[in-house]
Amino acid sequence: MFILDTNVISELRQGKPNASWAVRQWAAVQASNQLYLSAITLLELGLGVQALERQAPPQGSALRAWPNGVGRAFAGRILPFAETTAPLFATLHIPNPRADRDAMIAATAMEHGFAEVTRNVVDFEATGVKLLNPWAN
């Protein structure tokens, strides 16, 4: 099973110009019940849309409903950052602190035995989480 990183969800957005054919093809052959999100990904989508609304209001407004649509599409397949995930998250910061949201997503994937699907493999490599880069595969 897989946890999709924010960059994968963004790449799969309907109407995204110049979307990666490799990523879309990879996602198309996966059973939807094998694809999950971290709740942190929904946070990142919401933050991204809000930032875009400030920087480019027309584009941001056009995407305002998108994070909610992603949440509906993944209903029942969104994993929380839970009490049991927190200790694993803490260990990912020793000896080298990591970006909190990336470490939270990695800890969630590791707790469930899932692979992290991302383009940003460098951000996750040292965590020990299983990785898949659909841009490169």
Describe the residue ranges of each PLM region:
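Residues that scaffold the ATP/ADP-binding catalytic core of kinase and kinase-like folds
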Residues: 11-12, 48, 88-92, 127, ...
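Acidic, PIN/NYN-like endoribonuclease modules and their adjacent C-terminal/linker elements
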Residues: 1, 106, 110-137
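Short, well-structured N-terminal submotif of metal-dependent ribonuclease cores
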Residues: 1-37, 41, 51-69, 137
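Residues at the C-termini of beta-strands that transition into short coil/loop
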Residues: 39-40, 82, 120, 135
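General small-molecule cofactor/ligand-binding pocket signal
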Residues: 36, 79, 132
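A generic structural signal for short hydrophobic patches within well-formed alpha-helices
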Residues: 9, 42-45, 86, 124
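Active-site neighborhoods of divalent-metal-dependent phosphate/nucleic-acid chemistry enzymes
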Residues: 47-53, 61-64, 72-119
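Acidic active-site catalytic centers that drive phospho-/nucleotidyl reactions
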Residues: 5, 44, 102, 120-123
